[in-house]
């Protein structure tokens, strides 16, 4: 299966090893940020609504409607398929030759890790999970949360290391270099996963998070981005959209926000 591509978007999180992207159905492209600039990778075939995308800096990885993962460089190649019938891939992240995938089912989730070097797929199912709300590979481990208020930490073999109840509807998460994890909630609270300390920082819901060095950037349901220090003291805020921010990505000193309509707007980090 080969399709010519023309480069004419790359979303990157706060850490160089964690690259991201998303699918824009309206113009049939992969959207990403590179060197602080918004870019497009135009695909010469149909993109279906709500497809997921991952990126490791060399290739993009797209999930199709059959839960197959396709590697996209200058052509498209089949890599692997999740074995569960009836699940919906909701997360893809690619780091260090490994592709991490979450596939949602009714009150259950299937997690897969594909090692490109070994051409090997490892999958395990976890029950009593109602849809993945955040998904963070951490070194060789994997952290994820579900909308029904649970957080899971898995080892490199996908064995459960830790499971916590963290409160209703964690919507977003980010991590610092030392792997401290913060969770953002619908009610405007922030939770430090390691200490268990919660703090109310917004009156509106926290829909997106990005951690960078000693700073935290929060996107809310009204389209505003807030800048906090690591002690959760407010350092500034900027209106970016008129509706909910679903993702925040940072690259080269530029913050890029994505709203529910897949619009992208940028802010200089030092403008707060």
Q: Residue locations for each model-derived region?
A:
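A short beta-strand motif characteristic of beta-propeller blades
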Residues: 20, 39-48, 77-83, 119-126, ...
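Blade-level signature of beta-propeller repeat domains, shared across WD40, Kelch, NHL, RCC1
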Residues: 245-272
């Amino acid at each position: 299966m080969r399709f010519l591509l023309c480069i004419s978007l790359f979303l990157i999180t706060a850490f160089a090893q964690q690259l991201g992207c998303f699918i824009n159905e309206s113009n049939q492209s992969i959207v990403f940020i590179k060197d602080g600039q918004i870019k497009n990778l135009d695909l010469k075939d149909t993109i279906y609504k709500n497809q997921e995308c991952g990126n490791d800096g060399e290739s993009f990885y797209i999930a199709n409607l059959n839960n197959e993962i396709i590697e996209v460089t200058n052509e498209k190649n089949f890599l692997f398929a999740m074995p569960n019938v009836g699940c919906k891939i909701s997360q893809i992240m690619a780091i260090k030759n490994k592709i991490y995938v979450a596939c949602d089912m009714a009150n259950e989730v299937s997690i897969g890790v594909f090692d490109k070097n070994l051409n090997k797929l490892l999958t395990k199912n976890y029950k009593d999970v109602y849809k993945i709300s955040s998904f963070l590979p951490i070194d060789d481990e994997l952290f994820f949360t579900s909308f029904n208020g649970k957080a899971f930490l898995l080892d490199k073999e996908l064995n459960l290391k830790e499971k916590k109840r963290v409160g209703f509807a964690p919507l977003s998460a980010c991590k610092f270099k030392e792997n401290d994890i913060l969770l953002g909630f619908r009610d405007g609270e922030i939770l430090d996963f390691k200490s268990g300390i919660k703090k109310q920082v917004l009156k509106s819901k926290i829909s997106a998070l990005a951690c960078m060095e000693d700073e935290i950037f929060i996107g809310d349901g009204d389209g505003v981005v807030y800048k906090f220090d690591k002690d959760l003291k407010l350092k500034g805020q900027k209106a970016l959209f008129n509706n909910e921010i679903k993702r925040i990505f940072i690259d080269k000193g530029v913050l890029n926000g994505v709203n529910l309509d897949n619009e992208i707007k940028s802010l200089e980090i030092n403008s707060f």
